[in-house]
C-alpha cells in the first residue's frame, strides 16, 4: 500500500449524495464516526462491515445469477454503486470474471445495451451535439482524467455495428486498465461517438437509445472526430487516448492522422499486434529458435491482421533481416486468397504486405488466379498460423494437418472474438497435431486433454499489454506511444512466459499473475519512452517508485469531512 493510500481522504460530500458516488461510496463499510460526520446515520444498516465481508456477500450474490449476461449486469451494477468493492471482487476472482466483464460476454451486453441500460457511465457524444463537445467534456466530473477509451461502435468485436451499444467496450476496457494495470478508476473515462448506425435492427428497435440515423461518413465524419480530438486536447492535454473498435476504413487513417498530435494508440491494431508478437517471441524462445527464422501465414488481412504483420516485420528486422527479407516471410490470406501485388482491390495498408506474383511462379496458377489458404500452407510452409478473420472453422482439419506435416511444433493462434467466431478450437488443433502445436487464442478456453496430457491454453488477450502501456505512460508522463514502446511491451511479455521461465505451461502467463506482468511491461514501456525522448529521463529507482505510486489497490481509505 502506498503512503497516499494510508492517509485520510478529505471529502466535501455527505448524506445520500455521498452514497450515490461510486468512486467514494463504501456502503456498509463506513465507520461509526464517518456515519456521524457525513450524515449517514439511518441511511445504512447498523452493522459495520469490512471490505472482505462485503466481497463475500457480493460473490455469493454473483453465484445466484443464471446466465453470463446476468452476471455481467450484476457486476456492472456493483461498479455503478461502489467501484472499490467492484474492483476488490475482480481482484479476488479475476480469471473467473474477466470473461464476464469483457470478452466474450461484453459482446452480448453491447447487443442488448439499450435493453439492459441502468444508469449513466461515461460520455455519449452524438453528431447533433457536435457544436457543444467542449461543454460536454466540461460536464465530466472527473477533472484529472489520464486515460480515455473511445469508440464509434462500427466494428464491435466480430459483431459489427452496435450503435451506442458499443459503450460496453470502453467501459469493459477501462475496467481492465484498473483490474490488471492498477490505474485508478478516478483517472479513466469511457466515451462513445454516436454518429448514427447502419444496423437496421437498432434503427427499428423502439428501445434503442442512440441517435436514430444512418451513420455519418466521409468528410462529415472526419470533421466530427477532429472536433472531438481537439476538444479532448483542450480539456485534458496530457491524456492517453485509446481508439477502440473503429472499422478498418477509419481505424488506420485516424491513427496515422493523430499519432504525432497527441498521446494515442489503437488497441485493435497496435495492442493486438504487441500481444501477438509477445506470444510469438515466447514460443520462439521456448523452442530455441529466432523470430526471424519463422514464416507466418495470416487468415484475415484487415487492419488488425496487417498491424500484427507489420510489428512482426519490425521485430524480424531487429534480429538482422532487412525489410524485404522480412516481408517475404509474411503471407496474408483474405476471402479472395493470398494478397498479391497484381490484385486491384487492395486497401492502402495492404499493399506493402502483398507478395509479388512473380515470386510465386512455382506455386502454379495463372496471373490473377486466387491462391487459397490450403495452397498457401503447402507452398509457403509456415511455422506460424494466425487467424483474425472472424470466421468460424477456417482452420479446417486439412489445413492444420498440412501445417503440421512440415512443422513439428507450429504456433497456431485463432484470435477471432467472440468464441463463436474462432477459426478452430484448441481441442481441434491439438487433436489434429497429436498434441504438438503451441496454441494461443483470442477468447478464453479451458485446458485441453490430449491422451494423458492436460494442456493449458494461453489466451492471447490484449489485457496482457494495454494496462501495462497505460501504467508506463502515466508513470513516465510520456507524451506519445511509439512503435518502440509497443515492441518493448511485447518483449517484456515474452520474458514472463511460463514456457520461457519454467520450460512448461502455457505460452502466456496465468491471468492471476497479470498485475505483476503489467508492472514489468510498464517499466519496459517507460524506459523505452525515456530512451526515445518521449518522457523525461529518470533513474530506475525514481521510475519504479512512480509506477508503484500510480498503482491503485481496491482498499478503503479513512474519510475526513471538509467543505467545498
Curated annotation (Swiss-Prot):
GO biological process, one term: malate metabolic process
GO molecular function: malate dehydrogenase (decarboxylating) (NAD+) activity; metal ion binding; NAD binding; oxaloacetate decarboxylase activity
Record-annotated active site: 102 (proton donor), 173 (proton acceptor)
Lineage top rank: taxon: Bacteria
Disulfide-bonded cysteines: none
SUPFAM superfamilies given in the database record: Aminoacid dehydrogenase-like, N-terminal domain, NAD(P)-binding Rossmann-fold domains
UniProt cross-references to PROSITE patterns, sorted A to Z: MALIC_ENZYMES
Cofactor: binding details: Divalent metal cations. Prefers magnesium or manganese.
Enzyme class: oxidoreductase
Keywords: Metal-binding, NAD, Oxidoreductase
Catalytic reaction list: (S)-malate + NAD(+) = pyruvate + CO2 + NADH; oxaloacetate + H(+) = pyruvate + CO2
Family assignment from sequence similarity: Belongs to the malic enzymes family.
Record protein name field: NAD-dependent malic enzyme
Organism annotation: Pseudomonas aeruginosa (strain UCBPP-PA14)
Gene: maeA
Amino acid at each position: 500500500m502506498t503512503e497516499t493510500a494510508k492517509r485520510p481522504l478529505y471529502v466535501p460530500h455527505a448524506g445520500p449524495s455521498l452514497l450515490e458516488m461510486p468512486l467514494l461510496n463504501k456502503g456498509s463499510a463506513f465507520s461509526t464516526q464517518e456515519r456521524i460526520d457525513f450524515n449517514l446515520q439511518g441511511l445504512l444498516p447498523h452493522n459495520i462491515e469490512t471490505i472482505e465481508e462485503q466481497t463475500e456477500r457480493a460473490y455469493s450474490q454473483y453465484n445466484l445469477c443464471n446466465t453470463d449476461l446476468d452476471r455481467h449486469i450484476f457486476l456492472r451494477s456493483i461498479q455503478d454503486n461502489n467501484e472499490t468493492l467492484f474492483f476488490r471482487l475482480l481482484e479476488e476472482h479475476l480469471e473467473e470474471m474477466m470473461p464476464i466483464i469483457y470478452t466474450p460476454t461484453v459482446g452480448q451486453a453491447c447487443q442488448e445495451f439499450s435493453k439492459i441500460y441502468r444508469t449513466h457511465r461515461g460520455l455519449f457524444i452524438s453528431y447533433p451535439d457536435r457544436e457543444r463537445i467542449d461543454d460536454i467534456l466540461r460536464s465530466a466530473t472527473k477533472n484529472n482524467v489520464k486515460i480515455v477509451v473511445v469508440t464509434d461502435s462500427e466494428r464491435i468485436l466480430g459483431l459489427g455495428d452496435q450503435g451506442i451499444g458499443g459503450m460496453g467496450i470502453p467501459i469493459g476496457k477501462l475496467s481492465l486498465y484498473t483490474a490488471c494495470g492498477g490505474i485508478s478508476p478516478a483517472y479513466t473515462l469511457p466515451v462513445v461517438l454516436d454518429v448514427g448506425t447502419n444496423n437496421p435492427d437498432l434503427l427499428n428497435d423502439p428501445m434503442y437509445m442512440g441517435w436514430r440515423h444512418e451513420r455519418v461518413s466521409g468528410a462529415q465524419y472526419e470533421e466530427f472526430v477532429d472536433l472531438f480530438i481537439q476538444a479532448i486536447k483542450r480539456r485534458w492535454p496530457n491524456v492517453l487516448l485509446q481508439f477502440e473498435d473503429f472499422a478498418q476504413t477509419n481505424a488506420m487513417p485516424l491513427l496515422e492522422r493523430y499519432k504525432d498530435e497527441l498521446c494515442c494508440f489503437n488497441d485493435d491494431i497496435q495492442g493486438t499486434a504487441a500481444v501477438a508478437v509477445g506470444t510469438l517471441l515466447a514460443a520462439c524462445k521456448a523452442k530455441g529458435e529466432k523470430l526471424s527464422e519463422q514464416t507466418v501465414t495470416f487468415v484475415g488481412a484487415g487492419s488488425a491482421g496487417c498491424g500484427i504483420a507489420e510489428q512482426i516485420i519490425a521485430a524480424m528486422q531487429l534480429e538482422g533481416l532487412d525489410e524485404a527479407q522480412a516481408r517475404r516471410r509474411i503471407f496474408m490470406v483474405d476471402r479472395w486468397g493470398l494478397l498479391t501485388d497484381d490484385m486491384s482491390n487492395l486497401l492502402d495498408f495492404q499493399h506493402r504486405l502483398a507478395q509479388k506474383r512473380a515470386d510465386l511462379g512455382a506455386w502454379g496458377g495463372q496471373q490473377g488466379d486466387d491462391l487459397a489458404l490450403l495452397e498457401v500452407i503447402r507452398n509457403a510452409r509456415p511455422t506460424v498460423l494466425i487467424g483474425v478473420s472472424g470466421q468460424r472453422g477456417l482452420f479446417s482439419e486439412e489445413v492444420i494437418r498440412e501445417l503440421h506435416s512440415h512443422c513439428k511444433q507450429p504456433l497456431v493462434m485463432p484470435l477471432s472474438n467472440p468464441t463463436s467466431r474462432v477459426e478452430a478450437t484448441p481441442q481441434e488443433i491439438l487433436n489434429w497435431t497429436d498434441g504438438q502445436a503451441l496454441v494461443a487464442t483470442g477468447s478464453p478456453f479451458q485446458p485441453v486433454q490430449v491422451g494423458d496430457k492436460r494442456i493449458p491454453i494461453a489466451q492471447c488477450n490484449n489485457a496482457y499489454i494495454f494496462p501495462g502501456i497505460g501504467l508506463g505512460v502515466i508513470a513516465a508522463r510520456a507524451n506519445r506511444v511509439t512503435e518502440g514502446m509497443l515492441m518493448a511491451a511485447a518483449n517484456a511479455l515474452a520474458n514472463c512466459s511460463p514456457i520461457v521461465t519454467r520450460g512448461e505451461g502455457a505460452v502466456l502467463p496465468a491471468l492471476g499473475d497479470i498485475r505483476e506482468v503489467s508492472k514489468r511491461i510498464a517499466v519496459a514501456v517507460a524506459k523505452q519512452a525515456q530512451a526515445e525522448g518521449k518522457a523525461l529521463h529518470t533513474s530506475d529507482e525514481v521510475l519504479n517508485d512512480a509506477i508503484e505510486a500510480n498503482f491503485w489497490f481496491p482498499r478503503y481509505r479513512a474519510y475526513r469531512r471538509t467543505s467545498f
